[in-house]
């Protein structure tokens, strides 16, 4: 059997080699690989030839033939996040079931790296992009509008773009409204940059409005900013407790920052105090296991990954009855309030 030698010196099996060994035409091998009709006898011979030779179909050749690489670019803000891991699990479930693979890019919460990866993916062989979005700047909007492959956003509602998101304002309003009736004393708030429309701006505004609906004001002097991390929540809470030792409760924009605030309260007021004095967002499983559950908001992160990926692939695959790229708002659930 004839084998070609690649530039790396490794023997490369070609389709014609499989055909020669199986005693069939190259066209028959191609039909077998693409699920076309072929007799049982020929199919078995081709299967055995592939197993004997270790033949692997070239993804580049498939892309040239079909116009599809079966690759989806996925851009996430960080990989050490429970919410992101749930989202990517949902994405992976759908991609695997429908014959696609994932190329994962981690931005470390850097908005400029989101733009770099958007440019990289659309100029390299991916069929579409899923962006787990954080900050949406004018540059982001231009990049999304001009993207040459279909793109779906998760986590932000951007006008004119395909999005799967949760209503952060509504969820935060409900949380603030519920907490106002059970917290005696001053309430502080640790948020994130409001350049992040969903987690920063909408959650703070919604929480403040929820308190205000029952006559409780959020003192601007008791608002601090963190950076999504446990350490930033801890540092902000320690600073709040030093300048306002009579603070009764600290609401946080994420469960991770709430874990840091909980630790700070335990250090200042005694072990076990923190779990009764903080709230978060995200329903973190690890924090729930440690505390029994703090007041928080549960989002269907896995569902958002599933829905966004199905939306994208239905468009790419031309699934009948699907309306293509659109905006989808998912529900939420208050926990432990």
Regions found by a protein language model. Name each.
Residues 1-70:
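N-terminal helix-turn-helix DNA-binding module of bacterial transcription factors
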Residues 26-30, 64-80, 185-193:
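Short beta-strand segments enriched in small/hydrophobic residues
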Residues 56-128:
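Amphipathic helical "hinge" segments at domain boundaries
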Residues 76-86, 104-113, 164-174, 190-238, ...:
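Hinge/beta->alpha junction and helix N-cap segments in small-molecule ligand-binding domains
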Residues 126-132, 188-191, 223, 244-254, ...:
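Periplasmic-binding protein-like
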Residues 132-177, 182, 194-195, 256, ...:
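Flexible loop/hinge segments that line or gate small-molecule binding clefts
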Residues 185-186, 218-222, 269-277:
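Short acidic capping loops at alpha-helix termini that bridge into adjacent secondary structure
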Residues 243-249, 254-337:
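Flexible loop/turn connectors
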């Amino acid at each position: 059997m004839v084998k070609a030698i690649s530039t790396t010196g490794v023997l490369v099996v070609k389709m014609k080699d499989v055909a020669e060994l199986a005693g069939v035409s190259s066209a028959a091998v191609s039909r077998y690989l693409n699920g076309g009709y072929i007799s049982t006898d020929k199919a078995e011979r081709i299967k055995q030839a592939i197993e004997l030779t270790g033949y692997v179909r070239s993804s580049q050749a498939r892309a040239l033939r079909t116009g599809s690489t079966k690759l989806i670019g996925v851009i996430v803000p960080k990989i050490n996040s429970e919410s992101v891991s749930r989202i990517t699990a949902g994405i992976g479930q759908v991609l695997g079931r429908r014959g696609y693979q994932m190329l994962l890019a981690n931005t470390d919460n850097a908005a400029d790296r989101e733009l770099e990866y958007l440019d990289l993916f659309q100029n390299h062989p991916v069929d579409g992009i899923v962006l787990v979005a954080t900050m949406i700047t004018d540059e982001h909007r231009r990049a999304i509008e001009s993207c040459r492959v279909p793109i779906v956003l998760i986590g932000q509602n951007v006008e004119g773009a395909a999005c799967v998101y949760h209503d952060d304002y509504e969820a935060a309003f409900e949380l603030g409204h519920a907490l106002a009736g059970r917290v005696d004393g001053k309430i502080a708030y640790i948020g994130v940059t409001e350049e992040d429309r969903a987690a920063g701006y909408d959650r703070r505004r919604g929480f403040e409005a929820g308190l205000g609906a029952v006559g409780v004001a959020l003192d601007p002097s008791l608002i601090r900013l963190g950076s999504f991390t446990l350490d930033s929540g801890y540092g902000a809470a320690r600073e709040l407790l030093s300048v306002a030792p009579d603070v009764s409760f600290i609401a946080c924009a994420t469960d991770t920052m709430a874990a840091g605030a909980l630790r700070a309260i335990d250090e200042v007021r005694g072990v076990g105090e923190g779990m009764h004095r903080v709230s978060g967002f995200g329903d973190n499983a690890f924090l729930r296991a440690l505390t029994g559950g703090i007041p928080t908001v549960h989002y269907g992160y896995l569902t958002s990954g599933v829905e966004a990926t199905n939306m994208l692939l239905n468009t790419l695959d031309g699934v009948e009855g699907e309306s293509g790229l659109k905006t989808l708002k998912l529900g939420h659930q208050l926990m432990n309030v």
